[in-house]
Amino acid sequence: PLADKELIDSCYNLLDRNMMLETDGIYGQISVIDATTSEVLAWASLEKQLDGDCGWCGDMVYVPFKKQVCSTDIFVPFIAAKCLEESNTSLGKMVDTGCGILEVNDSLQIRDHNWRRGGYGKVTFEKALLMKSRIGMYKAFMTLPNGADLWEQAYDTIQKSNAIELAISFNQMYHQRSSLEYVKKIATGIFEKTGIQHRLAPRGIKLAGIYNILQCDDNKRSSDEFTFVGCFPADNPKYTISMVVVRPHKLPATIGMLSKEVNQLVEWLMNRNL
């Protein structure tokens, strides 16, 4: 069985020596599951201890796997794809994302990450989702009668999930039988040339998944949250993995901060089977 000491040690070493140092993380998780059965093969959980003199500068220690450490808003592009599928809306249909800022009502303003550069304008729904346009995703939700409620639920930033649950949920989404397979198209396309995360893809291995950053930008959170979830090889997945790192709010923060460690684990797992 793959759930052995070598795999578990590899996960802990990746957390301790790489992920936590790279992001200045204070708590991190990794999970590896079998993509065909959803069986948990390995997990790791580390936390930096508080030091009375210098705050979060204590030693890194093994800790029990916490159940509520991250939100689930990483899945919004995939839920948007499912909304389009359920409403029989083509990925090729044009959607106007405007200049990158959408005033929905007095209490809801949606901004794309490139709003300062003028947004994406008119693009296909597929392009909007592959570029993680929040306006494009919102309009995908609105193709369903209950889209507004679904949007509010999907963008809930409450810390209610963890790396194991993210991996299992994504695995179910990716393998859900569908004639259109919009979720698969978006999950794989994000790491291809037309996708926003194509520069983060591992070499020689087709990856399906997504990175996400949730930053403290609204005075409601005191921490930044880096997450990844994905499966590989995308055409016939053997593994689904997820990583979560939490740190006190600070800048800079880039979506690729976990990519080196994700790709190391992906390549290590694939080479292990050769």
Regions found by a protein language model. Name each.
Residues 1-29, 49-52, 225-228, 234-235, ...:
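Extracytoplasmic/periplasmic proteins that interact with beta-lactams or build/remodel peptidoglycan
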Residues 2-75, 87-88:
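Short pre-catalytic segments that frame enzyme active sites
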Residues 20-33, 91-96, 140-141, 152-153, ...:
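Surface-exposed patches in mature extracellular/periplasmic domains of secreted proteins
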Residues 1-8, 58, 68-77, 118-122, ...:
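Solvent-exposed, acidic/flexible segments
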Residues 11, 30, 38, 74-83, ...:
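Residue-level preference for non-acidic, small/hydrophobic
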Residues 145-175, 184-273:
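Active-site beta-strand/loop architecture of penicillin-binding DD-peptidases
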Residues 36, 64, 89-150, 172:
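Conserved catalytic neighborhood of penicillin-recognizing serine enzymes
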Residues 1-3, 18-20, 62-69, 109-116, ...:
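Second-shell loop/turn segments in exported
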